[in-house]
Amino acid sequence: MSKLSLSSLDKTHLEGKKVLVRVDFNVPLNEDGQITDDTRIRAAIPTIEYLVNHSAKVILAAHFGRPKGQVNEKMRLTPVAARLSELLGQSVALTNSCIGDEAVAKSNSLSNRDVLLLENVRFFGEEEKNDLEFAQKLASHADMYVNDAFGAAHRAHASTQGVTNYLSPSVAGFLLEKELKYLQGAVDSPNRPLAAIVGGSKVSSKIGVLDSLLDKCDKIMIGGGMIFTFYKARGLDVGKSLVEEDKLELAKDLEAKAKAKGVELLLPTDVVLANEFSPDAESKISQIDSISGNWMGLDIGPDSIKVFQNALAECKTIIWNGPMGVFEFDKFADGTNAIATTLADLSAFSEVCTIIGGGDSVAAVEKAGLAEKMSHISTGGGASLELLEGKILPGVAALNDA
């Protein structure tokens, strides 16, 4: 799916034009209302600076939190505007509302190279309903549209899809373009062998991804809490480990599908057990056929780490989505950290394309200080999963074709 991108527009297209840019500024705040991680804001800077440098008038639209269609003072974009001003080195004005007379007056008074941030679009329930009248009001601020919010591209909302009915051209920003290049590229035309490492606690949240990846991958490694559903489906005792009883047949089907397709499906052969779910729990290493009693598995074991590392060393493209264990507890973070280090090394020394597909794996890689060493770190959680599942993202489909 080739879409028109911002890189195809130059100063002749952009100078003096009001450009509505959908960005993903849904960043975490602490109790004092301070931003604790500005990754998503920094990720939008290349697109914003390109527009500023080409003398456009930049109007940013973003959501923050889940205000449920009402104004929530704790979910205003004030701290975001302040941080963005620092990163850009220029003042960023903020409206009181994303639509209405005050917002229109501010967008109409912009000079070339100015940046304006519209207040939280989710203060209006019409945003998530993709209400076209609301979308038209948003679109009335601008002459053209750029979507750079990959993290919201799987939503058919007014600011991601509806506005494209009223603004042309509607193009992909640099972040969205990069996300599609890596994630779509890994799925559609990877350098092989292609491996996927899928972790996390529940099979249910990764069914679509696993099923889709079985059609595309040469190897799949499974870790995290979901492995115990596979073990129980095989008839093994898993002690008090997390199991989704209603997904046992599905686990059997996925193993059978892998075998039928000739995909190497690797599950851990040993695990790190704990006597309780706690950072200070008593722990021990056990083979998967020796789990019993009150013990629960919270990480993959050292033998499994080596097997996974050897399998990954043979690959040219690797997608990682989901941790290998409860990495938030240092005692049970070895599996996740080992995978992160392995991918960083393969990326640096063997020119392997390493893609970290959103969510907890990103947090794990950042916690390990290895983010800079990966080929690509996705900014989307649900959007990454849906793209890897082979789904069409509404926010992407709505853009002009290249």
UniProtKB/Swiss-Prot annotation:
PROSITE patterns membership: PGLYCERATE_KINASE (PS00111)
UniProt KW keywords: ATP-binding, Cytoplasm, Glycolysis, Kinase, Nucleotide-binding, Transferase
Subcellular location: Cytoplasm
Source organism of this protein record: Prochlorococcus marinus (strain MIT 9301)
Gene that this polypeptide is encoded by: pgk
Catalytic activity: (2R)-3-phosphoglycerate + ATP = (2R)-3-phospho-glyceroyl phosphate + ADP
This protein's name: Phosphoglycerate kinase
Keyword ATP-binding: yes
Cellular component aspect of the GO annotation: cytosol
Location, primary (coarse class): cytoplasm
EC number: 2.7.2.3
Top-level EC class: transferase
Upper taxonomic lineage: Bacteria, Bacillati, Cyanobacteriota, Cyanophyceae, Synechococcales
Subunit organization: Monomer.
